[in-house]
Amino acid sequence: MTDAAYQACQRLAREHYENFPVASWMLPPGARPHIAAIYAFARAADDFADEGVRSPAERLALLDDWRRRLYEAASESPASGAAGESDIFVALSRTMRECRLDVRLFDDLLSAFAQDVTVTRYDTWDELLDYSRRSANPVGRLVLQVCGYRDAGLDHLSDQVCTALQLANFWQDLARDWAKGRLYVPREVFAAAPGQLRRARSAGARSNGFANATPA
């Protein structure tokens, strides 16, 4: 059953578009199924927060249930559920046990996804970087743990890389997020240079609605 669960997670990782490769061939072969399980957990949770036409209350309820199931998996008793979701937690439970993963890193991811439901703009760099600390940095630390590294220096370097990649990802998807009423550029940037927002709207991506969207 566990092998089939890992295979389902690996299929999800292969089939879902991402800006960066998932379970890359550059990773040790033994690590790839574990990375796929982590990805499947995070991908589903991110979709709860960001995709479809659910209300904010429905999104938050799904994330709360995902957190409950996370802690059940951490205690080696993954709960039953829809077939694809059960696969995720069967695989994740084994991955967490074999790789001795810190469940708090997964919880940080869920807190960031929940924040996405309720927060669409950031006033300061500190606020945006705190969000990135929870939405991106846990992934790098989990990869290190899967590969057998537990080192504060490596964690620090990984955090810097993950935050940088997260910011690059935000700004690559600026037009798409703007159309959803969300903007990952701090208000203090535009306060310091008021013309920047106007120029971004006029030069950014008229073809896909960027210029006409108006986040708060």
Regions picked out by a protein language model, each given a short descriptive name:
Residues 1-216:
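Acidic catalytic motifs of isoprenoid enzymes
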